From Swiss-Prot:
This is tRNA uridine 5-carboxymethylaminomethyl modification enzyme MnmG. FAD binds at G13, G14, G15, H16, A17, G18, V125, S180, Q370. The keyword Acetylation does not apply. NAD(+) binds at residues 273-287. It comes from Histophilus somni (strain 2336) (Haemophilus somnus). Homodimer. Heterotetramer of two MnmE and two MnmG subunits. GO terms for biological process: tRNA methylation; tRNA wobble uridine modification.
């Protein structure tokens, strides 16, 4: 039965990827339908109640710079904010927020329900409708069929999801939600490579049964950060502390004695888990020399008694989970309200995707989130945004867009996935980016907001504020460059009091700011450089741009060298087998990965610089050497 209404874009799934995808296409003024199995779980934080962190915070800022929701939701739901690596350079500083699950979900739902051009419908999707090799719509469990020109699939851990607690297991998408079994079967019939991954979550503990008095407190920063470039500290709810406990020899003994009841160590679970978020079983076995692991007790909200013990993700049986919890300081009498579990689920090899996140096999079908082999809310949201943008551009028959590696962490993420693929849950780190100094949290808007405006993602209010900031940066730099101090200046003594070495030549404000002992606040306290600018975001950009100018210019020169052939396109039907000089191994890899550009080909493991040179020569010979923009 076809539903009478047709859509431009249909988004399947209401998690972090799905919500960003749906909001993006709706902001592009396209008629969008978001299908979810449960409207009440839109924006659900299924695992840890936190947003951001190293690399992840950078993604959140980039999503916000392009008009996405995640940063605003975190600002309005964050109950503890911290700036990680605050003593280090600006490239690796990262914002993290402990979030109230209920508040976060409320912010997401309000945004979705008030977004023009967006309809929400509660129904499980059981099939996709194809016409030849193109998407045409979807079918739901009750037989409703919705037509659309493009579809974004963001099924999370629901595709053939299987939950494990001890040696018992059952079908489920997450605790309390059914798995998407029929859709998983249908998708396995497509020309896409499918495999299994695993993730896990710890038991939740009743706060009323924890002895907080004997535990160390961890407070957020006194100077509270914000995620959104449009956000303010006033948006934050009440701030509360987390607490710290530790595993001990007793904890580890309990785990070792019960490994024969672990689905991971008895071969029941075959999917590979996240390397950077291992289960407590894994930590005890892999780091056998350690007799203790730090565990953070994170409140799940201002109105909830549930506490998330970050660091003891487990799939051991419930009775063992109780012993693990009760073995730790402050938790001797603690009660579990939700057991921990592991979940196995289907994911698709992301090498079968274009960098736009459109599947190579089916025109108009886009994948985003954990089904592409990633882990984390932020990685999912970033993919959802990108998939939504490109689904919208596809419908409008416009040229697709995706960021370069030197342009955004979103670009690093999709390039890693689509070029190299992954066999374990992938997460973003700053160490994955070659040009970290250019991809800072603080300049995400400078990198991406103009592009987002062209794509139709940015409203007039945000655009005006962004332009005002850019103008403030330029005016302040001009002002500092125009003010000079010389050895005969009447302000010389005032300046020399704060300088490590006295002035012996004429300098301007930018020259002074480059000195390590001078920051913007100190500089603008000097009489000739008063008054300081009030726009704190612009001040930060001025100071970083001046202090790191040499390093930034060096990275930009390196990027220009790399870009010479980065975007040189390789035709989709290019015949590698007829190129003399390429080894069989190189040919096989190029045939398997089907890179869309020379840059992407160069990042495939085993593809040598010599092979790239041969490719370029042959592209030129065949008249195909067209450099992308």
């Amino acid at each position: 039965m076809f539903y009478t209404e047709n859509y431009d874009v249909i988004v399947i799934g209401g998690g972090h990827a799905g919500t960003e995808a749906a909001l993006a296409t709706a902001r592009m003024k396209l008629k969008t339908l978001l299908l979810t199995h449960n409207i009440d779980t839109l924006g659900q934080m299924s695992c840890n109640p936190a947003i951001g962190g190293i690399g992840k915070g950078h993604l959140v800022k980039e999503i916000d710079a392009m008009g996405g929701l995640m940063a605003t939701a975190a600002d309005k739901a964050g109950i503890q904010f911290r700036t990680l690596n605050s003593s280090k350079g600006p490239a690796v500083r990262a914002t993290r927020a402990q979030a109230d699950r209920v508040l976060y979900r409320q912010v997401v739902r309000i945004a979705l329900e008030n977004q023009p051009n967006l309809d929400i419908f509660q129904q499980e999707v059981t099939d996709i409708i194809l016409e030849k090799d193109s998407i045409a719509g979807v079918e739901t469990k009750m037989g409703l069929k919705f037509r659309a020109k493009s579809v974004v699939l963001t099924a999370g851990t629901f595709l053939a999801g299987k939950i494990h607690i001890g040696l018992e297991n059952y079908a489920g998408g997450r605790a309390g939600d059914p798995a998407s079994v029929n859709l998983a079967k249908k998708l396995r019939d497509l020309n896409l490579r499918v495999n299994r991954l695993k993730t896990g979550t710890p038991p939740r503990i009743d706060a009323r049964t924890i002895n907080f008095d004997i535990l160390a407190k961890q407070y957020g920063d006194e100077k509270l950060p914000v995620f959104s470039f449009m956000g303010s500290v006033e948006q934050h709810p009440e701030q509360i502390p987390c607490y710290i406990t530790h595993t001990n020899d007793q904890t580890h003994d309990v785990i070792r004695k019960n490994l024969d009841r672990s689905p991971m160590y008895t071969g029941v679970i075959e999917g590979i888990g996240p390397r950077y978020c291992p289960s407590i079983e894994d930590k005890v076995i892999r780091f056998s020399d350690r007799n203790s692991h730090q565990i953070y007790l994170e409140p799940e909200g201002l109105t909830s008694n549930e506490v998330y013990p970050n660091g003891i993700s487990t799939s051991l049986p419930f009775d063992v989970q109780m012993k693990i919890v009760n073995s730790m300081k402050g938790l001797e009498k603690a009660r579990i309200v939700k057991p921990g579990y592991a979940i196995e689920y289907d994911y698709f090899d992301p090498r079968d995707l274009k960098p736009t996140l459109e599947t190579k096999a089916i025109s108009g079908l886009f994948f985003a989130g954990q089904i592409n082999g990633t882990t984390g809310y932020e990685e999912a949201a970033a993919q959802g945004l990108l998939a939504g943008i490109n689904a919208g551009l596809f419908v409008q028959e416009k040229e697709s867009w995706f960021p370069r590696r030197d342009q955004a962490y979103i670009g690093v993420l999709v390039d890693d996935l689509c070029t190299v693929g992954t066999k374990e849950p992938y997460r973003v780190f700053t160490s994955r980016a070659e040009y970290r100094l250019l991809l800072r949290e603080d300049n995400a808007d400078i990198r991406l907001t103009s592009i987002a405006r062209e794509l139709g993602l940015i409203d007039d209010i945000r655009w005006a504020r962004f332009n005002q900031k850019m103008e403030n940066i330029e005016l302040e730099r001009q002002r500092l460059r125009s003010i000079w101090l010389h050895p005969r200046s009447e302000y010389l003594n005032e300046a020399n009091e704060i300088l490590k070495s006295p002035l012996v030549r004429e300098v301007n404000g930018e020259d002074l700011l480059r000195r390590p002992e001078i920051n913007y606040q100190i500089l603008t306290a000097l009489t000739p450089f008063k008054p300081a600018m009030e726009d704190k975001e612009a001040v930060e950009q001025v100071e970083i741009a001046i202090k790191y100018q040499g390093y930034i210019e060096h990275q930009q020169e390196e990027i220009e060298r790399q870009k010479r052939h980065e975007n040189t396109a390789i035709p989709a039907n290019f015949d590698y087998k007829n190129i003399s000089g390429l080894s069989n191994e190189v040919c096989a890899k190029l045939e398997q990965y089907r890179p869309i550009s020379i840059g992407q080909a160069s990042r495939i493991s085993g593809i040598t610089p010599a092979a790239i040179s041969i490719l370029l020569v042959n592209l030129k010979k065949q008249g195909m050497l067209k450099r992308g923009e």
